[in-house]
């Protein structure tokens, strides 16, 4: 690891909600997901996994195929809090090294590990210790521990190792991070030249009343409080040095999906918005899936 690397936005990223510092937001998020992991997740009331169980949502929305679902231990399904399936469009090849930023309970680690095969490796990066332990448990249950490594680290942190990954995936995580440029800097660093990213994340689209946006940010709840406009988000990706940026899919959340996304990982763990406030964001919260490449030097 390169210990001499500097943070991209200072020790304490500036962009925060109007009422909380970046450090406070991250601590709240870490505790929230750790508590959720301690309980082993839940098959109900998940953020993007709207209506009923995580499994039914995934199948219903084609996020994960039936073949995918058959490979995933129940624990990983219950801990799953994604908004897409980056392994389905990441073009992962046998023998590659895949890093999952904010790997959570390991659902995408399992699928990526099957794709890289016995000569490849997957690396789960997450800052919540109990979540990371659950992902280890999941990989063991799936019989894939020999091709999995874990790094317990903030993905905004410059201690993330350099030039080791062919592919970086991330599923519904970067919206939670106060300093998105910091995360994309670390994704750039961990990728080998010519490597690529495949991301599923939550963004906003269309006009959002600034007061409504400020209100959402002040609570920083679920996977909507930190969501930023898609065009600004994609500019951050390009400014980090990535090329060949391509949005491969978008899904606009309906009110029910929005309600569950806004209280991710579940109403017991996260602050919630009133139905009235959520209605003001309806049609404007989108799950976007995109690819980009780190140019060869
Ligand atoms: C919404 S869950 C998604 C988990 C997983 N990707 C999935 O699809 O189920 C967000 C995950 O990102 C992790 N996370 C959030 N912010 C992080 C940060 N700054 N550094 C590392 N992990 C982070 C949380 O601990 C949690 O496990």
Question: Where are the predicted features?
Answer:
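Short, glycine-/aromatic-enriched active-site segment of Class I SAM-dependent methyltransferases
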Residues: 203-224
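A short SAM/SAH-binding and catalytic strip from SAM-dependent methyltransferases
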Residues: 166-179
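C-terminal lobe and adjacent flexible extensions of AdoMet/dcAdoMet transferase-like proteins
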Residues: 10-12, 34-39, 50, 240-297
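Class I SAM-dependent methyltransferase SAM/SAH-binding core
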Residues: 78, 85, 93-157, 182
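Short alpha-helix
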Residues: 225-241
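Conserved alpha-helix/loop element of class I SAM-dependent methyltransferases that forms part
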Residues: 50-97, 108-111, 115
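N-terminal auxiliary segments of SAM/dcSAM-dependent transferases
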Residues: 2-58
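A short glycine-rich, Lys/Arg-flanked "PGG" loop and its adjoining helix->strand segment in the class I
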Residues: 181-196
């Amino acid at each position: 690891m390169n210990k001499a690397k500097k943070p991209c936005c200072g020790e304490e990223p500036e962009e925060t909600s109007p009422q909380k510092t970046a450090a406070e937001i991250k601590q709240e998020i870490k505790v929230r997901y750790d508590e959720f992991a301690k309980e082993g997740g839940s098959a109900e009331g998940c953020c993007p996994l709207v209506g009923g169980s995580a499994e039914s949502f995934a199948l219903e929305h084609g996020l994960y195929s039936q073949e995918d679902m058959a490979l995933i231990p129940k624990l990983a399904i219950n801990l799953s809090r994604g908004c897409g399936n980056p392994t389905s469009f990441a073009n992962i090849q046998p023998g590659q090294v895949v890093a999952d930023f904010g790997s959570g309970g390991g659902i995408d680690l399992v699928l990526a590990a099957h794709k890289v095969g016995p000569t490849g490796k997957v690396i789960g990066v997450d800052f919540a210790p109990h979540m990371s332990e659950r992902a280890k448990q999941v990989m063991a249950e799936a019989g894939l521990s020999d091709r999995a490594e874990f790094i317990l680290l903030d993905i905004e942190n410059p201690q993330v190792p350099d030039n080791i990954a062919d592919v970086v995936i991330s599923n519904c995580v970067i919206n939670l991070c106060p300093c998105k440029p910091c995360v994309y800097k670390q994704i750039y660093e961990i990728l080998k030249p010519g490597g690529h990213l495949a991301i599923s994340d939550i963004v906003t689209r269309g006009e959002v009343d600034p007061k409504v946006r400020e209100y959402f940010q002040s609570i920083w709840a679920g996977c909507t409080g930190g969501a930023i406009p898609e065009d600004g988000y994609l500019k951050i990706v390009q400014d980090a040095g990535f090329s060949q940026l391509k949005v491969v899919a978008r899904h606009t959340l309906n009110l029910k999906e929005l309600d569950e996304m806004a209280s991710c990982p579940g109403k017991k763990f996260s602050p919630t918005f009133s139905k009235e406030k959520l209605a003001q964001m309806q049609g404007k919260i989108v799950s976007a899936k995109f690819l980009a490449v780190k140019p060869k030097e």
